[in-house]
Regions:
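Acidic/histidine-rich catalytic neighborhood of metal-dependent amide-processing enzymes
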Residues: 147-226, 262, 339-350, 514-520
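Acidic-enriched catalytic cores of C-N bond-cleaving enzymes acting on peptides and small amides
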Residues: 211-222, 226-235, 240-293, 297-360, ...
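A generic structural motif
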Residues: 97-99, 249, 284-291, 370-373, ...
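An extended, acidic, His-containing surface patch that forms the Zn2+-binding/catalytic region
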Residues: 294, 298-366, 379-385, 400-520
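Predominant activation on well-ordered alpha-helical scaffold segments within soluble catalytic domains
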Residues: 44, 79, 152-159, 188, ...
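Acidic/His- and Gly-rich active-site-bordering loop/insert found
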Residues: 11-140, 164-168, 463
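Active-site metal-coordination/substrate-binding segment of hydrolases
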Residues: 107-176, 182, 194, 471-494
Length: 520
């Protein structure tokens, strides 16, 4: 519990808050504790649905929705939960659902935005990822943190405000989308056809306030020449925004090559490197598997990129031939670090810090090596110059650069009254002196007018939290986008209670002051 935490305490020390805020927070605390089990069960209902966004086309859209059956089911279930709590719901063609009042005045509305899609599960789970369970105070399952737990919490936030009779001069509305992790086509479509609120809070970040997000460039580096025998294929990674924890190669079998790979593996282990699995699949195939430690690509520190581990290993195997080892040496350089130094795009600014660049998905495309780059570039960096440098790097290294998207940075003025109020209230509550921040992660804020990301992550951990995490989760697991994704229930309920207080206070500001900032 943080200095000004209150979860599970009656009459907790809230000396940093004004008396009226402390009194309201105590009422909110009691309400959430009374609904605690129902909230957990509703999160479980959502987590049981494997809602990985998979775009559909043509006739399949009517049957499966625009992002596949899983996302369609998740939208149906979320809107059903909301109706059970007395809210009016609308389904925006399975792109975005809305939860709130039947008659809406968006010019006078504070909107909350969450997503119901999740990243692919990857490997390394202790138990099935879509069978949520509680272990030592953590709710575990894909999407509990990112972003189904917060999404369900927003329904209860609105219900709490309604049932406690907290007078609000602005309406509240929850918006839930289905394609945040893959490309945000849900929001692009929705905003082209439907109205948006006067201000939007995206509960997919941390406290106190995220007032800016780096730009995102995604694309692929494709080898100009095909991989030569004995290489059949290479692959690894499951999502463009995840550092991969597994990468593979399939090679033509020969006893000589097998002996060389096993010898390299022994040398690697003797030098303290991680072991690479070398397996004979049949008389025609050797499979090589390299392991790493996954993290979100926007926050790569602490990860180990399995693509790099595989490329380094294969680049040492003379039996693969000079042309192949040259390709793998280039790939090893690309995946060796996370700040774009290899590609010549390294940059940092005072507002947003370092640009990051991660190799996240490896594949074989028509016999050629293909690696996906997920780049989060600093707010003041010129993306056109960045793209020119990527083109130059590719040309100098026997590669072709293929741009997939360039999502421009989002910047909301740090001096804005809403940002200042929410930051100050958080610091009063926690007894801290933190500042609003810019992050590399991408949220719906970059796609919406008058929007910024706010909560519910980043709550201070106490010693017990850290001890439980150490017992439950091995390195590279427990976080969003990681195996055994876990939601610390103590911190979750503490955050939701505070979020409710913050919304009640935000309501006192004039919406006419909410003017969207422009990218620098």
């Amino acid at each position: 519990m943080g200095k000004r935490g209150f979860a599970g305490l009656k009459g907790a020390d809230m000396a940093g808050l004004k008396e009226e805020d402390s009194e309201l927070l105590a009422r909110i605390d009691a309400w959430f504790e009374a609904h605690r089990q129902n909230i957990i069960e509703d999160i479980k209902r959502m987590v049981r649905i494997p809602s990985i966004s998979k775009p559909t086309e043509g006739d399949a859209i009517e049957k499966e929705g625009p992002f596949g059956t899983g996302c369609r089911q998740a939208m149906d279930e979320m809107l059903s939960i909301a109706r059970e709590h007395g809210f009016f719901t609308e389904n925006g063609e399975y792109y975005v659902g809305t939860i709130g009042l039947e008659k809406k005045n968006y010019d006078n509305t504070i909107g909350f935005w969450n997503h119901l899609d999740v990243v692919p599960v990857g490997e390394g789970w202790t138990r099935p990822p879509f069978e949520p369970y509680i272990n030592d105070g953590f709710l575990i399952g894909r999407g509990v943190q990112d972003n189904k737990g917060p999404a369900v919490g927003m329904i209860y936030l609105m219900q709490c405000i309604r049932e406690l009779g907290i007078g609000m001069k602005h309406e509240l509305c929850l918006f839930v989308g289905c394609d945040e992790e893959r490309g945000m086509e849900d929001i692009a479509y929705y905003t082209s056809k439907y109205e948006t609120p006067a201000i939007s809070l995206i509960a997919d970040s941390g406290f106190p306030v995220c007032y800016g997000e780096k730009g995102i460039v995604e694309g692929q580096l494709l080898s100009n020449d095909s991989l030569k025998k004995p290489v059949q294929s290479v692959w690894g990674g499951s999502a463009s925004n995840m550092i991969p924890d597994r990468a593979y190669a399939r090679l033509d079998y020969s006893e000589k090559l097998l002996n060389e790979l096993e010898s390299l593996n022994e040398k690697r282990k003797a030098e303290g490197g991680t072991e690479v699995a070398v397996r004979v699949q049949d008389e025609a195939c050797i499979e090589v598997e390299a392991c790493g430690t996954s993290r979100h690509s926007a926050f790569p520190d602490g990860s180990v990129n399995a693509i790099h581990e595989l490329a380094v290993f294969l680049g040492q195997a003379d039996g693969l031939g000079v042309e192949n080892t040259a390709v793998f040496a280039t790939l090893a350089g690309i995946a060796s670090e996370y700040y774009g130094r290899t590609e010549g795009i390294d940059f940092q600014d005072e507002v947003s810090g370092h640009t990051t660049c991660a190799a996240t998905v490896l594949s074989t495309e028509n016999g050629k090596m293909c690696v996906n780059l997920n780049i989060r570039y600093a707010i003041t960096q010129d993306s056109e110059e960045l793209l020119r440098r990527l083109e130059a790097f590719a040309g100098e290294n026997g590669l072709t650069w293929r741009l997939e998207r360039d999502s421009k940075p989002n910047y909301f003025p740090k001096e804005h009254p809403a940002v200042e109020y929410l930051t100050r209230l958080y610091n009063e509550w926690q007894g801290l002196d933190t500042e609003a921040f810019v992050m590399g992660g991408g949220t719906y804020a970059r796609m919406l007018p008058r929007a910024f990301a706010y909560g519910i992550g980043g709550m201070p951990k106490n010693d017990e939290d850290r001890e439980r995490e150490a017992r439950l989760f091995k390195k590279g697991s427990g976080g969003a986008h990681e195996p055994d994704e876990g939601l610390n229930l103590r911190m979750y309920f503490e955050a939701m209670k505070f979020y409710t207080l913050a919304v009640a206070g935000l309501d006192k500001l004039e919406l006419s002051s909410f003017v969207m900032g422009k990218p620098i």
